[in-house]
Every structure is written in C-alpha cells, then in structure tokens.
Amino acid sequence: MSNEQEKQDYVVDKKGIGEVKIASDVVAVIAGLAANEVDGVDSMAGNITNELIGMLGMKNLSKGVKVVMEEGTVRVDIAINVIYGYSIPKITKQVQEKVRQQIENMTGLIVPEVNVRVAGVNTAD
C-alpha cells in the first residue's frame, strides 16, 4: 500500500521564519507504529512488494498504510493481521483511535478518517 501512494509533503506551519512540511512517509510510519501498539494486532498487511522487502530483511515501517491528503486533512487506510481469539471490532476501533491520536499529536494534522482493513488472522506464536 505504501508504495502505491504518491509522495506528498504536508505543510503544517507557514508562520514564523519558514515553512514546516511533513512527508507522507512520515505520517505512514506513525500510523504503522501506532497500529502495532494495539493489543491483538499481529502485524501489518502489505502488498507483494512489501512482502518481498520483508523477506530481504529490510524493515518497512509503513507497510500496509496508505495516506492521502484531502482538503487540508489526512485520510489513512491501514491493513492489519489480527491474532486469533481477539475481538475484531474491538481491535479495529482501538487501531482507529490510536492512529488518529498519534498522527494528530505528533504532527498537528487533522485526521477525520482512519479506514482499517483486516487482511488476515494469525495464531499467536
């Protein structure tokens, strides 16, 4: 998902002595890290490119995350794998809240929408 998104910079501050921009990849990494903090999330789900990157031992912290800037706000689409036995509605709600909270707190950007797709269920190891 992350590789599909167009690289964008979000302007968060035009006041003062210069402009502050945040890259879309930074927002995607924040979203991925926040989602992984939720109990019951096993891993992020990605496309085939992300899977190959993982097999090569490279770490892709924005795997399974797509970030889109629309009218001064940020929309996040995120794909996760959950652990068998956990409540999917509860996990997805917590992911939505955690992702929105972390992006807004760390960047000052407004996040009106966090879409979560459960791509798989894995057993706990």
Where are these regions (language model features)?
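Terminal low-complexity, intrinsically disordered regions
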Residues: M1-E37, D42-A45, E51-I53
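Soluble periplasmic/extracytoplasmic beta-strand elements of cell-envelope proteins
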Residues: K21, I30, K66, R75-N81, ...
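Short secondary-structure junctions
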Residues: V38-M44, N60-L61, M106-I110
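Short edge beta-strands and adjacent turn/loop segments
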Residues: M44, L52-A79, V121-T123
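A short interface-forming secondary-structure element
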Residues: G72, V76-K93
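Extended, positively charged loop/linker patches that create polyanion-binding surfaces
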Residues: N81, Q102-E104, V121
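Short, non-transmembrane amphipathic alpha-helical segments
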Residues: I88-T107
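Short, highly charged C-terminal tails/helix-capping segments
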Residues: E113-D125
